[in-house]
UniProtKB/Swiss-Prot annotation:
Its EC number is 4.3.1.18. Keywords: Lyase, Pyridoxal phosphate. It catalyses: D-serine = pyruvate + NH4(+). Belongs to the serine/threonine dehydratase family. DsdA subfamily. It holds the Pfam family PALP. This is Probable D-serine dehydratase. Coiled coil: none annotated. One of its GO terms (biological process) is D-serine catabolic process. The modification N6-(pyridoxal phosphate)lysine is found at residue 111. It comes from the Bacteria. Its cofactor is pyridoxal 5'-phosphate. GO terms for molecular function: D-serine ammonia-lyase activity; hydro-lyase activity; pyridoxal phosphate binding.
Length: 445
């Protein structure tokens, strides 16, 4: 049987994916009922409340967070220069912004939102169970000697391509937990080194992300007092990401950008296993409903969420199943199989997905540097082509027409997911590579 035949994928879509051709796919399932296990409004409120009550603790642990009072928040930067530079005039409709999660302190990526939330939830649970904190206790008590001694009896473990490991590792080790990060072959050396300088145990694997996660899960299962952060199915991670929605809503209101039937919001999010974009989309849908249109961006070598959403919902699918190799410079997005939790929710809520090849990643990375003064890692630039796909492609224009959307009234938010902690020499290497490829023929559409 030919590769991909049994996945219930449209043959034309399958051919596009197998050819590594950048593709926009529109989700026909958008608007279907949410699964029964979907988080509730109370779950979202609890996550937001947790991050707020722990803000003082975070400010005490990390000097970088004192300016924000310990809140995990990033700027919303206008992207008018990027819009003006769009190659096709028809891609310039609406107002463009970049959500700067690349600038999140301490962890330097979007993973701070989910990772910090899960570690804080664990720390609160242990402290309350052992009488070290109550419902009204100042959470700075979790940095006390007694709390650290208790946490030292516990291990926090995670599997990661890099950024989630940084997020979990930085906070868990700061609180006194023994911390172990299983890292895939895609993980960058500087991320491993940064963790080790914080006393985190890094276990390196020759395999991909899924193998690193599975190794961590199996090791954790045999250890007492060990909490495994499961990027493929964690509700705590998912809810932490969802808290970004209220932050973005406040920033859009401050910028004078309403979100309603006449003024739709388009959000473009880099996507690996799906948890971070899934959580953010879930939070935004809770606020704006049908007026938010979310598109996830994946490497052409690793479109695991697109494959899962476009295929049979009942069976987990991998990019390997359609003959792709999951090899990309976007190390943070090098994931072969989607999170079942995130995929089930994105199936009901995402407007679609688009793919980006490595040449485009580096072109977008260079645009971010030259037009906006932002230094990104390659995976963080994956979504920069989103507005052009919507306004400049046949499928994108059909999506707008089908919903009666005036493209000039839309707001586009491009999520930049990581880069501020990348060493300067790495940024220079990224940008030199991008300039070299531009000189020999550009990056394509």
């Amino acid at each position: 049987m030919p590769v991909g035949r049994s996945l219930s994928l449209d043959p034309n879509l399958l051919a596009q994916l197998q050819s590594h051709s950048p593709t926009l796919w529109l989700n026909p399932h958008q608007g279907m009922p949410l699964p029964d296990f979907a988080p509730t409004a109370a779950d979202l409120a609890d996550a937001d409340a947790r991050l707020r009550r722990c803000a003082g603790l975070l400010a005490e642990l990390f000097a970088e967070l004192r300016l924000s009072g310990g809140l995990i928040a990033s700027p919303l930067q206008p992207a008018e220069p990027l819009k003006r530079a769009a190659r096709a005039g028809h891609a310039q409709a609406g107002a463009w912004y970049v959500k700067r999660d690349d600038a999140l302190p301490v962890a330097g990526s979007i993973k701070a939102r989910g990772g910090f939330h899960e570690v804080l939830a664990l720390a609160e649970s242990i402290a309350e169970r052992h009488g070290l904190a109550g419902a009204d206790t100042d959470r700075r008590a979790l940095a006390s000697g007694a709390a650290r001694a208790r946490f030292a009896r516990h291990t926090v473990m995670v599997g990661s391509t890099g950024n989630l490991g940084l997020s979990i590792g930085m906070l868990a080790s700061a609180l006194g937990f023994r911390t172990v990060v299983h890292m895939s072959a895609d993980a960058k050396a500087w991320k491993k080194a940064r963790l080790r300088t914080r006393g985190v145990e890094v276990v390196e694997h020759a395999g991909d992300y899924a193998k690193a996660v599975d190794a961590g899960r199996r090791q954790a299962a045999g250890m007492p007092c060990c909490h495994f952060v499961d990027d493929e199915g964690s509700r705590m991670l998912f809810l932490g990401y969802a808290t970004a929605a209220a932050e973005l809503a406040a920033q859009l209101a401050q910028a004078g950008r309403p979100v309603d039937a006449r003024h739709p919001l388009f959000v473009h999010l880099p996507c690996g296993v799906g948890g971070a974009p899934g959580g953010i989309v879930y939070g935004l849908k809770a606020l704006y409903g049908e007026h938010v249109h979310a598109f996830v961006a994946e490497p052409t070598a690793s479109p695991c969420v697109l494959v899962q959403l476009a295929g049979d919902a009942a069976h987990p699918r991998s990019v390997y199943d359609i003959g792709l190799d999951n090899r990309t410079e976007a190390d943070g997005l090098a994931v072969a199989q989607a999170s079942p939790l995130a995929a089930a929710l994105l199936r009901a809520q995402a407007a679609g997905a688009f793919t980006v090849d490595d040449r485009q990643l580096f072109a977008h990375l260079l645009d971010a540097r030259e037009r906006l003064g932002i230094d990104l890692e390659p995976s963080a630039a994956a979504a920069f082509g989103g507005p052009a796909w919507i306004a400049g492609s046949d499928a994108g224009r059909a999506y707008l027409r089908g919903r009666g959307i005036d493209p000039d009234a839309a707001t586009h938010v491009i999520w930049a997911t990581g880069g501020s902690l990348v060493p300067a020499q790495e940024h220079r290497r990224f940008q030199a590579h991008a300039r070299a490829q531009r000189q020999v023929g550009g990056a394509g559409a």
